Amino acid sequence: HIRSFNSNGMVAIKDKEVMPMDVDRVIETARAMPIPADQEILHILTQEFIIDDQDSIREPIGMSGFRLEVKVHIVTGAVSAAQNIVKCVRRCGIEVNDLVLQPLASSYAVLSEDEKELGVCLVDIGGGTTDIAVWTQGAIRHTSVIPIAGDQITNDIAMALRTPTREAEDIKCRYGCALSQLADAEEFL
């Protein structure tokens, strides 16, 4: 129920110096993409600004020019799924300020600014989904939520070995290895 895509927008700079309202306007032009009625925008993440073909600008306010462009990463989610999450949390007596895409939250929690600047792909293999966030030059370039994860691996082990799920989970946790160079060449599974 999560989708993401990159977009861009462009506006003329009104007073030849970029003001906050120019930034707001250019981001609005970038978000003017057709989005299905069952989806809502969760995030508009700025990647970079461009002023008169000068790219890689992070903070354009106060700079001079005639044309302001922006590149953004837009994340949308299913309206009903978002509403159900908010309802569930509110029923627990907690107010929801905002919804945050899980790979984005993980990125903020575990990645350093240097990693995001140099380029990194965060892969979080959970129980039900594998979440991906790709960063370069300090900006998020791609996000994805894939509905294949640890539970699927456990089920595959259970089917292949004809063993109960509980035992398959134990096998996965004890002997599973995501990096081939860390696996023992003498072991076979």
Language-model region placement:
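Short, glycine/acidic-enriched loop or turn micro-motifs at the edges of active sites
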Residues: G127
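Residue-level detector of high-confidence beta-strand sites
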Residues: T143-V145
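Short beta-strand scaffold segments in enzyme catalytic cores
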Residues: D131-V134
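Nucleotide/phosphate-binding catalytic cleft detector across ATP-hydrolyzing
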Residues: H1-L122, A139-R141, G150, L161-L189
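A short beta-strand motif that forms part of the nucleic acid-binding face
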Residues: T136-Q137, P147
